[in-house]
Regions:
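Bacterial N-terminal signal peptides
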Residues: 2-9
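Sec/Tat signal peptide C-region and signal peptidase I cleavage site
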Residues: 10-15
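Mature extracytoplasmic or organellar-lumen-exposed domains after removal of signal/transit peptides
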Residues: 17-133
Length: 133
């Protein structure tokens, strides 16, 4: 748990000195993707799929990173990132080689980190994307 706090803390400030909104969120997604990959490598495909679903629905979509990306970076780009989550889940379900799952996982990690930095540099606030405001 201390490790998670340290990772999130390191990503908590954008270069401009403003608090980071999206980079800590990206690191939460990465933790679920890491868990999915680890679970898959030890043979627990069901837990691996659940971790991917949690990364996507529980963090990426529910916490509005997807919406922020769609409006700031673009719908086509966001769709391609979203598609990677589905590809990882499908690769796990179809029992692909762990190296294939790793490649997809690495693509997700790179994409969410890169895009979180873009959102933070653009000073996109999370509050804009909350429902019923």
């Amino acid at each position: 748990m201390a490790f998670i706090g340290a990772v999130l803390g390191m990503a908590a400030v954008v270069r401009s000195g403003e608090p980071s909104v999206w980079q800590p969120l990206a690191e939460e997604i990465v933790l679920f993707i890491d868990e999915a990959e680890t679970r898959y490598r030890v043979g627990d495909a069901r837990a691996a799929q659940r971790a991917v679903v949690e990364a996507y629905f529980g963090v990426f979509e529910d916490r509005k990173m997807e919406a922020a990306m769609r409006t700031t970076i673009g719908a086509k780009h966001t769709y391609l990132v979203e598609k990677q989550f589905g590809s990882m889940r499908k690769a796990i379900k179809s029992r692909e080689n762990p190296d294939v799952v790793h490649e997809i996982a690495e693509g997700i990690r790179q994409a969410v980190r890169r895009d979180a930095e873009v959102l933070d540099r653009a000073s996109v606030p999370a509050e804009v994307f909350k429902v019923n405001q």
